[in-house]
Amino acid sequence: MNESAKTLVAGLGSTHGDDQAGWLVAENVASQCRGYQHVTVRRATIPLDVLDWLDGVDVLHVCDACQMTHDHRQLQRYNLVEGQFINSDVSMNSEMSGTLLSLRSRGSHDFGLPDVLRLAAQIQQLPKQVIVWAIAGTDFQPGAGMTVETTSAAAQTVVEILKELRM
């Protein structure tokens, strides 16, 4: 990672069980990056919040919990390339697209993460590099705690982001 590249790590979440994963990642990355002047870490409750923070950002890491039924991996990393989410193996299939589309898009007036990233591109605010960390979750009930599996995947997400920040 280029030390001069301004990086934003955004953790999306809520108080609903495994949906806390993005916030947990943000808190842990922030505690590990206090001396990194080029790194900003924020917590968001809706993807649209991220749009307000993109000015001057070169690299964006977005961390969010989602229900993934097509894959048994607890953590998946996607790069946004020319409007498409690409993982290390193949282009994102329609099931994953639907998963990302539904992330925090609960009403007709809400924007899901893909919508926010498309809007950022249209208004020329999309960072040069966008990485989405999809953390598998199973329990999204209000007031529930995080499951052991999702907590572990969130911890692994922190490790992976820190590796990239130190490159």
Give, region by region, the residue ranges found by the protein language model.
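N-terminal catalytic or cofactor-binding beta/alpha core of small enzyme domains
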Residues: 1-128, 132-135, 144-155, 160-167
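Conserved catalytic-site region of short-chain dehydrogenase/reductase
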Residues: 139
